[in-house]
Amino acid sequence: MEDLKLTIRDIPDFPKKGIIFKDITTLLQDAKSFTRMIDMIANRYIGQRIDKVVGVEARGFLIGAALAYRLGAGVVLVRKPGKLPSETFSKTYDLEYGTDTLEIHKDAIKPGEKILIADDLLATGGTMAAVVDMVTNMQGEIVECCFMTELTFLDGRKKLPEGKVYSLMQF
């Protein structure tokens, strides 16, 4: 695991001064590291009959699609407003300064489907809590919310269903 962590570079003062940004593009660019990361996460869910993997815009699309392929599941996209072509459900949620909104196609999840929600990073948990609400309202059965990385000092998992959070790497 430590070798995977070493493929993620720190970018100081991005996106603003005082922040150390965990840049996952270096891991994604390395075929062996990317494959290993996806396999390590996917192995947790093999045999659980996941119906769909929900990928959260934008880096969650990369991880979600790769996991869905490995698990033989469909892919559902959660996007910013106005990006999905058919009828959507939307969820507005609070940010540190303001609000944001996410959308999902109304017909993307059927009641009782087993859903894995995937994103690259668990930080404050606000975005994922909004996605959990949407999937729950659509009567999807959330297997887990999975992340490639987690910033544990931000306590994001406190906003998510207890026992339904998995992160491969913690910082």
Curated annotation (Swiss-Prot):
Pfam families according to UniProt: Pribosyltran
Keyword Protease among record annotations: no
Quaternary structure note: Homodimer.
Pathway, per record: Purine metabolism; AMP biosynthesis via salvage pathway; AMP from adenine: step 1/1
Membrane in keyword set: no
Organism: Trichlorobacter lovleyi (strain ATCC BAA-1151 / DSM 17278 / SZ)
HAMAP family reported in the protein's UniProt record: Aden_phosphoribosyltr (MF_00004)
Keywords: Cytoplasm, Glycosyltransferase, Purine salvage, Transferase
CDD domains: PRTases_typeI (cd06223)
Family to which the UniProt record says this protein belongs: Belongs to the purine/pyrimidine phosphoribosyltransferase family.
Compartment(s): Cytoplasm
Segments crossing the lipid bilayer: none
Protein name: Adenine phosphoribosyltransferase
One Gene Ontology term from the biological process aspect of the record: purine ribonucleoside salvage
Entry function: Catalyzes a salvage reaction resulting in the formation of AMP, that is energically less costly than de novo synthesis.
Primary location class: cytoplasm
Cited InterPro entries: Ade_phspho_trans, PRibTrfase_dom, PRTase-like, UPRTase/APRTase
Catalytic activity reported: AMP + diphosphate = 5-phospho-alpha-D-ribose 1-diphosphate + adenine
Enzyme Commission numbers on file: 2.4.2.7
Molecular function terms, GO-annotated: adenine binding; adenine phosphoribosyltransferase activity; AMP binding
Entries under Gene3D superfamilies matching the protein: 3.40.50.2020
Enzyme class: transferase
PANTHER family attached to this UniProt entry: ADENINE PHOSPHORIBOSYLTRANSFERASE
Gene Ontology CC terms, in alphabetical order: cytoplasm
